[in-house]
Regions:
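Short, compositionally biased P/S/T/A/G/V-rich stretches that sit at domain boundaries
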Residues: 4-56, 143-145
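Functional beta-strand-loop-alpha-helix junction segments that form "active/interaction loops"
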Residues: 46, 56, 88, 93-106, ...
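Surface-exposed, short loops/turns at beta-strand junctions within beta-sandwich domains
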Residues: 109-116
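Caspase-like (clan CD) cysteine peptidase catalytic core
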Residues: 154, 193, 210-234, 238-301
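Glycine- and acidic-residue-enriched helix-capping/strand-helix junction motifs
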Residues: 166-184, 336-342
Length: 346
């Protein structure tokens, strides 16, 4: 998927678009690795149905062994998902430190949520080919209800909108208005659903990289597995020369042609992925109303739409989170004076 996924491939082929064949010799493609997830807790309540292993537990934590093997390659990464969301558990991202081994085992402890916990492991080899997943289910029922377990989930909102960039060439008209309208709608709509709503709102000069990262770290420290996290961003989004997707905070001075500066001041897809893994909230939604101003849009920028769409699709799939984006392939998000908003948020 990481190498060969092409957004909207069939309709683009039917429209007559020509694609350069990938520079891959099919004879060099290695077999997919295998992976096995083993529950190391009490197994007296084990149920097996259609090869799916289901365990019952009164402990709030589950100890797991994950073993990955590759017959003709090495293991480069092991991923663990809990109820569909990528997690880190007790290891450092489950990345294999010794990339030369054909077999690797990771042991980690997972914090369970009350009820059903579907735990899925996936291994990747050096060519980034994924294994067939290994899945177990742990049904957690606490032996005794604690008072703090009776508190409902919290909604964590991080909302960013940038109209006035440090570089005036990139000024937008309605990003801040869009962000404000979204904040108001979410606060009003969440009152009957969540026990608490925690909101961080960053606009214009407040929306530099340092402040956005600090706000993400705050959510990482406070969000619980039963909570929900929503990240909303209205501003510029670009693909670098190295084909990496970046959000563009207030203090980015150049969108194209300086990847080092973009990496220093921008927020990359890789950084978003790391925060998503480390934030414990299992329900996560990322909304990107990211566009390019007329001053920034040129033939190079327009041609990167497909690469941006691919980057977002890979990010959503790898993290197990949900993403809504304003622009599709070779499009840019529109702003309308008669609406007073960008079309996507409106």
């Amino acid at each position: 998927f990481e190498q060969f996924y092409t957004p909207s491939l069939l309709p683009r082929l039917l429209q007559g678009e020509n694609f350069t064949p990938p520079a891959v010799d099919i004879n060099t493609i290695k077999k997919a690795p295998t992976v096995k997830i083993t529950y190391k807790g009490e197994t007296r309540n084990l149920e097996v149905a259609d090869d799916d292993q289901v365990y019952a537990s009164s402990s709030p934590k589950a100890l797991l062994d994950i073993t990955a093997s590759s017959a003709d390659d090495v293991i480069s990464e092991i991923r663990l998902y809990q109820n569909g969301k990528l997690i880190t558990g007790g290891t450092r991202n489950l990345v294999v430190e010794d990339a030369g081994k054909p077999t690797d085992t990771k042991t980690l402890e997972v914090e369970l949520t009350e009820g059903e916990n579907i735990l899925k492991a996936v291994a990747l080899n050096s060519q980034r080919t994924e294994s067939k997943p290994s899945v177990i289910t742990v049904n957690y029922k606490p032996a005794k209800k604690e008072d703090n377990n009776l508190v409902g989930p919290t909604l964590h909102l991080l909302i960013v909108g940038v109209n006035n960039y440090k570089n005036p060439k990139y000024t937008l008209n309605y990003a801040s208005a869009d962000a404000t309208a979204f904040k108001d709608a979410m606060e009003n709509g969440s009152k009957e659903i969540f026990s608490k709503t925690s909101v961080t709102f960053l606009s214009d000069a407040q929306a530099g990289k340092d402040n956005i990262v600090a706000a993400l770290n705050k959510v990482k420290e406070t969000a619980a597995p039963q909570d929900m996290f929503v990240f909303y961003y209205a501003g510029h989004g670009v693909i670098s020369d190295a084909k990496e997707f970046f959000l563009v905070p207030y203090d980015v001075l150049q969108l194209y042609g300086n990847d080092d500066a973009l990496a220093q001041k921008g927020i990359s897809a890789e950084q978003l992925q790391e925060f998503s893994k480390e934030i414990k909230a299992q329900k996560q939604l990322f909304i990107l109303d990211a566009c390019q101003s007329a001053g920034a849009l040129n033939e190079v920028a327009a041609s990167r739409g497909a690469a941006e769409e691919k980057a977002i699709a890979q990010l959503a799939r790898s993290t197990g989170t949900h993403w809504l984006t304003a622009s599709g392939s070779e499009q840019f998000a529109s702003e309308f004076a008669q609406l007073g908003h960008g079309s996507f948020t409106y």
